[in-house]
């Protein structure tokens, strides 16, 4: 009795295997994810064009979603008034971010708070606060680079103008899409962000060294000025001392001459008295 061979389709197993490789090998780097999407979709496309296209767009959508989950919420505020905000997710992170905003110091600085596996990153500058909520595993470098990009773009568009009088959430339509673009860019280009951060850190370090050297030079300049002032004072004091010395010498000379004249006068008087007493007055012959 002939046994018929039942063909088994390997497509589901291939799909699961490739998708598992995709998730486990490049889960933390969206940039590598997109490269893997292209290579895997080309391999799948060689089997079936239609299936390959569907596979490509499916993986690309997964990549985009995973990348966007790294930065989940952002806003720009004037004081405590949120002018524009953007998110594609739901959760209490918006309320937590707003509560942190109320307690932020008004001085220009950067702040990061950790809560429930997320980081709440703030950049405060000139009365405006830029915030982004990120997954804790992303670190601090990408969120801070995102805030710098948002700050520069926001200042170019609204610096000294509309933002100073805008009402709460009034800039959502104009600038909300920009927040989304900056989020996606920072997530898609982590290597570039890392390089820029290193360059900025080096520039900041060099700037700090230069400022320290300038302060030392200025400090030395102040010391030199003090030495010059002291030299001038010593020269002036020496001149005064010479003048006073001359006056004292003259005074002492006059005092000595006066004493000598008095002594000479006393001697002459004594001589006259002796002569007069011997001669019996002025009749001495």
Swiss-Prot record:
Matching SUPFAM superfamilies: SNARE fusion complex (SSF58038), SNARE-like (SSF64356)
Domain Longin: 75-179
Chief localization: membrane
Membrane topology: Single-pass type IV membrane protein
Keywords, alphabetical: Cell membrane, Coiled coil, Endosome, Membrane, Protein transport, Transmembrane, Transmembrane helix, Transport
Chain ranges passing through the membrane: 262-282
Alphabetical GO biological process terms: protein transport; vesicle-mediated transport
Cellular localisation: Cell membrane; Early endosome membrane
Expressing tissues: Expressed in flowers, leaves, stems and roots.
Superkingdom per UniProt: Eukaryota
Domain v-SNARE coiled-coil homology, first and last residues per copy: 195-255
Matches recorded under InterPro entries: Longin-like_dom_sf (IPR011012), Longin_dom (IPR010908), Synaptobrevin-like (IPR001388), Synaptobrevin-like_transport (IPR051097), V_SNARE_CC (IPR042855)
Residue numbers on the Vesicular membrane side: 283-285
GO terms under cellular component: early endosome membrane; endosome; plasma membrane
Cytoplasmic topological intervals: 1-261
PANTHER family: SNARE PROTEINS, VESICLE-ASSOCIATED MEMBRANE PROTEIN 725-RELATED
Cited function: Involved in the targeting and/or fusion of transport vesicles to their target membrane.
Family from the record: Belongs to the synaptobrevin family.
Name listed for the protein in its UniProt record: Vesicle-associated membrane protein 725
Name of the gene encoding the protein in the UniProt record: VAMP725
